[in-house]
Curated annotation (Swiss-Prot):
Residues 1-34 are annotated as: Disordered. It comes from the Eukaryota. This is Nucleolar protein 16. Belongs to the NOP16 family. It comes from Caenorhabditis elegans. It is found in: Nucleus, Nucleolus. Keywords: Nucleus. GO terms for cellular component: nucleolus; nucleus. It holds the Pfam family Nop16.
Length: 189
């Protein structure tokens, strides 16, 4: 007589599959510690924790701790001392954690990061921003300009305004269209 339910044995332990899982996790951990910034990638120490690495570089691990927000404390106004009781408002103490960092290395890393940011900003400032609209939006802008000119209120009431753009949205879209390369191409043709 055959069984209706198949009997299952103990699941087999496959060393190869478990080793693959372990190696994959290990690779993912390594990927997390890598940074796109070359100076951070160069000074990163695999043996240290991320918090220790960042502290040694002189960078803030938690920006909220680095630049604390001033807490509004209620001042005691017109408080009259009672006999035998003194009122003392404690000042908050600064919490210092961790070991000393290498000051020269930290200064070097920070100066390199600042220099890299300046170079990126200069490169961005040199480039003109390119505006693009989708092909359908370009057609719509050309149609609206031909039909209504610069009257954004009329564009809003037009039956082809399927997305129900407001006059401000039309103004922005038309400005973007005029700054785009497609508009310049259409004007020259």
């Amino acid at each position: 007589m055959a069984r209706d339910v198949k009997k299952r044995g103990k699941p087999a332990y496959t060393n190869r599959r478990n080793r693959q899982k372990y190696l994959k996790k290990k690779d993912n951990k390594k990927k997390l510690s890598k940074s796109a910034v070359p100076i951070i990638k160069y000074t990163w120490d695999e043996t240290k924790t991320p918090r220790e690495n960042v502290r040694d570089m002189g960078i803030a691990f938690n920006p909220n701790d680095a630049v604390p927000i001033a807490e509004h404390r209620k001042e005691i106004i017109d408080a009259e001392p009672i006999d035998g009781v003194s009122i003392v408002v404690p000042k908050p103490e600064k919490k210092v954690t961790g070991r000393k960092k290498n000051e020269k290395q930290a200064a070097h890393i920070i100066s390199n990061l600042e220099q890299q940011v300046k170079e990126e900003e200069e490169a961005r400032a040199g480039q003109d921003r390119k505006f693009r609209l989708f092909h359908r939006e370009t057609e719509l802008c050309v149609y609206m300009l031909a039909r209504h000119g610069e009257d954004f209120q009329a564009m809003t009431r037009d039956p082809k305004n399927l997305w129900q753009y407001t006059p401000k949205q039309w103004a922005k879209k038309i400005r973007t269209h005029k700054e785009s390369e497609m508009c310049k191409f259409l004007e020259t043709a």
